[in-house]
A protein has these predicted regions:
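A general structural signal for well-ordered alpha-helical segments in protein cores
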Residues: 37-41, 76, 80, 176-180
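DPxDG-like acidic metal-binding loop motif
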Residues: 60-91
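N-terminal phosphate-binding loop and adjacent alpha-helix
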Residues: 31-49
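Generic structural marker for isolated residues within well-ordered, non-membrane alpha-helices
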Residues: 44, 80, 97
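Oxyanion-binding and handling regions
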Residues: 1-22, 35, 92-207
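Phosphate/pyrophosphate-binding loops at sites that engage ATP/ADP/AMP, CoA/4′-phosphopantetheine
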Residues: 44-60, 140-145
Length: 207
């Protein structure tokens, strides 16, 4: 049994799959001043209960490793590592960039751009390209070779350079389903090897 979850982006997503069958998924949004990632534990608990399962039925965890909000990445990584360690589960980490690259069918090669701040964007073209300068990415976009999938801030920067562009936040999507589909093409790993991909490094206190 596979459990997938993501709190790194616009909502919390969780899903269950048994072999090739997706059993159930759930999407949780912010509630008032409470960020959606705060509901991850209860979301997983309710999802398992609804499907007459317990944590001991899970064999594999799939989690988003970022980039995204610091709070969301931390929630995903903490829950994934604790569950995997306590239940002896295999894990699969998938980047937000790869997830978003599958959110819609594109006419051309998808180029995913997420705001990395400091005049940079996290870029994906078949693989993670890293945080690249906005100006160099503008040159890449202007070749006309790509279908752009972005967040809202990158959409505002690049929409004047391409007609083939969409912000993923404006699309109907279920990232849990996408993660489950992607995971079928990946090898499982040990939880110790899950590495977060932060937009900015987390603060180091005491310096």
């Amino acid at each position: 049994m596979l459990l997938a979850f993501d709190t790194c982006l616009d909502k919390t997503y969780a899903g269950l799959a048994d072999k090739d069958k997706i059993l159930d998924t759930v999407i949780v949004e912010n509630e008032g001043n409470t960020y959606h990632s705060a509901f991850l534990i209860s979301c997983i608990r309710d999802l398992l209960k609804k499907n007459n399962l317990t944590p001991k039925d899970i064999t594999t965890l799939v989690t988003d490793v970022g980039p995204g909000s610091f709070t969301g990445i931390r929630a995903c990584m903490t829950v994934a590592k604790v569950m995997a360690q306590q239940l002896n589960l295999k894990t699969i980490g998938i980047s937000s960039l790869e997830i978003i690259s599958n959110v819609t069918k594109t006419k051309k090669e998808p180029l995913v751009l997420l705001d990395a701040r400091k005049n940079k964007a996290y870029a994906w073209e078949k693989e993670i390209l890293g945080a690249l300068p906005i100006e160099s990415l503008k040159e890449k976009v202007m070749t006309g070779n790509y279908s752009l999938i972005t967040d809202d801030s990158m959409y505002a920067l690049f929409c004047s350079l391409s007609d083939d562009i969409v912000s993923y936040t404006r699309l109907e999507h279920d990232f849990a389903k996408i993660m489950i589909e992607i995971s079928r093409q990946k090898e499982t790993d040990n939880w110790q090897n899950l590495k977060p991909l932060y937009i900015q490094p987390p603060p180091v206190f005491g310096r």
